[in-house]
Amino acid sequence: MGIPASRSSQIADHASSLLHEAGPVRIRRCRYGVMAYIVHDSYIGRSLDLYGEFSPGEAALFAQLLRPGMTALDVGANMGAHTVLFAQKVGPQGRVIAYEPQRVIHQLLCANVMMNGHMNVEARHAAAGSEKSELKVPPVNYGAAGNYGSLALGGYQQGESVPIETIDSLQLPQCHFIKADVEGMESEVIKGAHETLKRCRPLLYVENDRREKSAALIELLFAADYRLYWHLSPYYTAENYFGNADNIFPGTISINMLAVPKESSLKIDGAREVKSADEDWRVVNAQPQ
C-alpha cells in the first residue's frame, strides 16, 4: 500500500455551501458531509470554513485503510472532521467509537454525526487513558480565536469533571483501527489499550509531535510488536473541496506515525519506517530515501 496524496475532485461552490450561522457556529456543506464548526477555531474550524475539509493527507490515508464492517476508534475526535469519514468508510455494519472530553466540542461532534445520519457512531463525552479516573476540563472561551484542539488535559484543579476510560474497558469483540490525537497523551491511550492491542491487533495512527515524549511512545509501540512509519500531512492542499488557492497554513504539517502489526502483510510504500526510539522526524525526513 502506498501513502496516498490528497485527492482531487470537482470543486464545490463556497458561497452556496453555507447552510446556517448562529453566533460562532457555522454549518457548511463539506467534502464528507454537512459539518457544524466554530469559526474561531484556528485549525479545524478555519479549515472547514475555507477549504471544506481538514488535514486532507490524513483523510486520504484513512479512506484507504478503512473498510466496510470495521470497528474504528477516533480518540481525540474534536468536532468530528475525521469521525464522519470513519463512519462512511466502515458503513452501517461497522462501528465507530469517538472520544471527546470538551463538552462544547463534543456537542458539535454529536451534531455532525447525526446531521449526516451516522447511526454507527458512539460519541463518548470522555477521555481515553491508561486507567479509569477523571480529569478537569478548564473553561474555554469558544467566542475567541484559539486552537481548541491543542488543549492539553491533565493537571487542572478546576473545571468540568470528565471521566477517563480505558479502551480495554470497552471489551470490544473486534477492533481494526485506532486513531489517537490527544496532545501528548498518546502513550497513556496505548497503555489503556494493552489487552485490545494483543487480542485484536488493530492498525494505529498516533500523533507524535512532542520530541520530549517521542522516544517513550515509540518504545511502547515497538514493545507491542508494531512496525512504525512516519506520516507527515500538510494542512493545506490546492486540491481542497472549495478550490481555495489561499494557503493560510504555509509549512504547517501534522506529525503522526502509522503503526502496523509486525505479523501483518500490509506493505507501506512511500513512507519512512521508524528504526529507533531516538529518531527525530525532522532529521530523518530531511534525508534522501
Predicted regions and their residues:
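Phosphate/nucleotide-binding beta-alpha loop and adjacent structural elements of enzyme active sites
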Residues: 1-289
